[in-house]
Amino acid sequence: MSIVAERKRLLADRELRGSEFTLQLSDATDQWLQDLFSSVVDERQDLALIAVGGYGRRDLSPLSDLDVLLLHDDAQDIESIAESLWYPIWDQGENLGHSVRTITETLDLANEDLDTATSLLSSRIIAGSQSLADELVGLALQQWKSKTKLWLPKLAASIH
């Protein structure tokens, strides 16, 4: 499936509006990325492709960035896997916000960066190891709760 063709089909559907459109576009994007992930990666328990930010919330518009995290458990071949995932996405003309990290690296960054911390709150797995993704989400939520008194004033200040 071409995500470009699917986006055009969804845009041409005059019945789709607002949140229903964003949900269907997110679902179509999920399927496209799941197919891509399956073609690049054999079944492995040390990798997960995770949607974060607006994409994690299933709030995609036609020009939204695809914000994704390739989570790994210290995979030695991660650089070649990442390139095999990112290039087909770029070839489709997609704007890609991407990162490649372990759980520890992700939590270390989220501990210091409000944007990363909040993006993890709306993260969801697209493909790969559910247990690896669940571990990250659980630890990120614990970390968020432990830093609530620090983060909430910063979050409030960023809104104004």
Model-identified regions with their sequence ranges:
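Core structural elements
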Residues: 2-3, 52-56, 152-160
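Hydrophobic/basic alpha-helical segments enriched in Actinobacteria
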Residues: 6-7, 21, 70-73, 81-82
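Non-transmembrane, amphipathic alpha-helical segments
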Residues: 17-21, 25, 77, 143, ...
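Conserved catalytic core of two-metal-ion nucleotidyltransferases
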Residues: 26-27, 34, 40, 78-131, ...
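N-terminal regions immediately upstream of nucleotidyltransferase
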Residues: 1-45, 63
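Short, compositionally biased low-complexity segments
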Residues: 1-12, 59-60, 111, 124-133
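Active-site nucleotide-donor binding segment shared across nucleotidyl transfer reactions
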Residues: 33-79
